[in-house]
Amino acid sequence: MQYVSTRAAASAASQSPQQFSDILLGGLAPDGGLYLPTEYPQVTGAELDAWRKLSYAELAFEILKKFATDIPEADLKALTAKTYTADVYRNVREGESAADITPLRVLEASKGRKLVLQALSNGPTLAFKDMAMQLLGNLFEYALAKKNAELNIFGATSGDTGSAAEYAMRGKKGIRVFMLSPHKKMSAFQTAQMFSLQDPNIFNIAVEGVFDDCQDMVKAVSNDLPFKAKQKIGTVNSINWARVVAQVVYYFRGYLAATTSNEQKVSFTCLLYTSPSPRD
């Protein structure tokens, strides 16, 4: 599987396709575009039937191997097995199994239709972003070790992205995280999550201002390509394709767990709870 920039047609410099491991560490393309696959893999009915019997980690491997073709399958399988464990996603409700990773609960059933809730916030920081960030941390560490390289992650957050990224990257070899956040404008819970970390590779920077001020600084650095390359700067926000692919997995998991055959259809609705930020 190869990847090209969304701006490839307008930029000759970005025409050369990249491998998954390359775009994993690079984030945005040099021309400022997003990396996308040159083609999208198809999933057959037979594959869906087989996937119904898999654990979450096994399902993640089956989906990711369609996109990360430059990573040996044995290595990729080990990475998903390391990431999606009951110990990592242990913050389940009473009666739910942590081994399910994203357990489903039927809220309502009537006339052959069901309303089902899929839990995505059982990870270390109780945010749905743990689902992708935990895998991203392991992928980063793996790819950097292969290249004997280092990466400085520079990000901005108003809460959940920062804590999820830091808990995923803490202690990872070859990785340092520099996270900007607006001073006194996050929830007390998320502030405590981030600023209580003592890992030597995690750096929290409180900025006088609002989230947009933090984000503007990150964008300025990202747009300075020579500086970005020299300082080996990467990103963990949603422009990183690896994070998008990791999120694809729980949609498949939700569908397969909520249905018994491929003929059944499911409509997804995303519900996101956000805690209010303190007033100035």
Question: Where are the regions that the model predicts?
Answer:
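Charged, compositionally biased N-terminal leader segments and the immediate start
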Residues: M1-D31
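Well-ordered mid-protein domain cores that form the structural environment of catalytic cofactors
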Residues: L104, E108, L115-A168
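Active-site nucleophile and cofactor-binding loops and adjacent substrate-binding regions
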Residues: L126-F128, N152-S158, V236-V244, T269-L272
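Short coil/turn connectors at secondary-structure junctions
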Residues: D31, G112-K114, N148-L151, K172-R176, ...
